[in-house]
Amino acid sequence: MKKQGVLHRDLAALIASLGHRDAIVVADSGLPVPPGVNCIDLAVTKGIPPLLPVLQVILYEMVVERVVIADELQVNQSLVKSIADEVTPVSLEVVSHEQLKSLSQRARAVIRTGEWTPYANVILYSGVAF
């Protein structure tokens, strides 16, 4: 039994299976999951779990080379700053929400949280550890 890091079986398996430049989306509770894209649904109720702690645990185990958020999220500078702080030294790439939804069609999975903040979605692209 694992004692730290990602304990959710499906999420741990997803992270372990990622190859270079594979994408996953850590999403709020409202992002539509594209047909054919796996959804790992962590949402329990409104706000639980929030996006940021889920992102932190994923980043503990995942090498990330690119991060994308929606321009519309920038109205919530507190959350944007928290996300930017977590993914440093990688910078945030900002696209429209429509572009983010389009990019999510090529993701390996959408990890749905209980986050109740509009546009609180983050696409993580896998890097390499060497």
UniProtKB/Swiss-Prot annotation:
Task: State the compartments where it is located.
Answer: Cytoplasm
Gene name linked to the record: rbsD
Question: Which proteins does it associate with, and in what oligomeric form?
Answer: Homodecamer.
InterPro entries noted in UniProt: D-ribose_pyranase, RbsD-like_sf, RbsD_FucU
Q: Which family does it belong to?
A: Belongs to the RbsD / FucU family. RbsD subfamily.
Which species does the entry assign this protein to?
Desulforamulus reducens (strain ATCC BAA-1160 / DSM 100696 / MI-1)
For this protein, the record's PANTHER family field holds:
D-RIBOSE PYRANASE (PTHR37831:SF1)
Q: What is this protein called?
A: D-ribose pyranase
Q: Which GO terms describe its molecular function?
A: D-ribose pyranase activity; intramolecular lyase activity; monosaccharide binding
**Entry GO terms, CC:** cytosol
* Gene3D superfamilies documented for this protein: RbsD-like domain
Keywords from UniProt, A to Z, are: Carbohydrate metabolism, Cytoplasm, Isomerase
